Amino acid sequence: MKDNYILAFETSCDETSVAILKNGNELLCNIIASQINSHKRFGGVVPEIASRHHVEQITVCIEAALEEAEISADQLTAVAVTEGPGLNGALLVGIMAAKTFAWANHLPLIPVNHMAGHLMAASLVDTIEYPAMALLVSGGHSELVYVEKEGSYKKVGETRDDAAGEAYDKVGRVMGLTYPSGKVIDELAHKGADTYNFPRAMMNTHEVEFSFSGLKSAFINLVHNENQKGNDVIADDLENLAASFQAAVVDVLMAKTKLAMEKYPVKTLIIGGGVSANQGLRERLSAEITDEKLIIPPLRLCGDNAGMIAAAAYIEWKKGLENVQAGLDLNAKPSLVFEDIEEGEV
C-alpha cells in the first residue's frame, strides 16, 4: 500500500508551523517559528504583527519541512490547513499558502479545526481508545469534548467567560511577569502553598461549565486591597499567591473533567492545548485519573504546531476526500466551534 504523506499548515495565532506526517502516526518534521519575543513587550499577541510574521516565515517553514522530512512535493498525498478558530489575518496567511501549494502541486486540500488538532495530538503519542473525553485548555479556549468514535467531536462544556490560559496571562501581568506567564506561575506555584482563599466558581454545580473571571477579579482585588494597606504581597508573597491561584484553577478543571466523565463514561481522557503543559495540572491528573487511560502529549505538542493539524487531517482523510476536501474558495473561520452535544445523544 502506498504511503500517506500529509503536509500541514498552522498559523492560527502566533506560531508559524509546517509539518509532514507519514501514515498518520510518524511525524517526519514539525517546523515551528515562534513569535513570542515580538509580542512580549505588548503583554499579548498583536494580530497585525502576528500576520506579518507569518508572511515572512511561511515559505521558510515549507522549505525547511520538505528538507528535514526528505520528501518531495510529488510524494505528498494531501495538504492540510487550520481554518479556525483563531485570528482572522493569521489564519488567512496559512490558508493562502496551503491553497497555493495544493493548487500548484495538484493535491487535495483538507481544512482542520484547530481544536481538533489539539485533541488529536494525543494520537501521535498513544492509541486512543474510544469513546474518549478531551479537556482542551489554552489561552483562548477551555472546553470538554466528547469523542464517541474517531473523527466525531461534540462539545459537552466550556468556559462562560475567560479561558484558563487567559486568566493565567492576566494574573501574570498583575504579578509583573512577562508574557506568556503560565510557565513562570507554574514554577512559582511549586515553591509556594495554597494560603489564600480564592474562589472556585461553579465547583458545586452539576453543569459541565467553567468560569475563571471571578478568580481573576478576586486575585486583582486582593493585591489592590493589600496595597491600600501598605502591604506589597507581590514582592513579599509571590510564591504563595501563585500557588493559591493555580490551585483554584486546577481544582475547577479537575472537578468539571470528572463530572463530564460521570455524565459521559469513556475509556480515554485526553489533555490538549497550551495549558496542558502545566505541571500542576499534569500531576493532579496523573494522581487522580486511574480508571481511564490518560494521554497527555509531550510539551513539544502542547502548544500550537502543524503536527497536530496533520494528525487531525489524517482522520478526516480516512473519511474519504469526497466528504472532507475543500475547494480553492476556502476561507478563514475565526469563530469555528465544535457542535454542542444534544441531550440524550449518548
UniProtKB/Swiss-Prot annotation:
EC number, as in UniProt: 2.3.1.234
Coarse class of the protein's main subcellular location: cytoplasm
Any single GO BP term: tRNA threonylcarbamoyladenosine modification
Cofactor needs: Fe(2+)
Enzyme class: transferase
Residues binding Fe cation, per UniProt: 114, 118, 304
Alphabetically ordered keywords of this record: Acyltransferase, Cytoplasm, Iron, Metal-binding, Transferase, tRNA processing
Domain of life: Bacteria
Similarity section: Belongs to the KAE1 / TsaD family.
Functional description taken from the UniProt entry: Required for the formation of a threonylcarbamoyl group on adenosine at position 37 (t(6)A37) in tRNAs that read codons beginning with adenine. Is involved in the transfer of the threonylcarbamoyl moiety of threonylcarbamoyl-AMP (TC-AMP) to the N6 group of A37, together with TsaE and TsaB. TsaD likely plays a direct catalytic role in this reaction.
Entry-linked HAMAP family: TsaD (MF_01445)
Record protein name field: tRNA N6-adenosine threonylcarbamoyltransferase
Species whose genome carries this gene: Lactococcus lactis subsp. lactis (strain IL1403)
Gene: tsaD
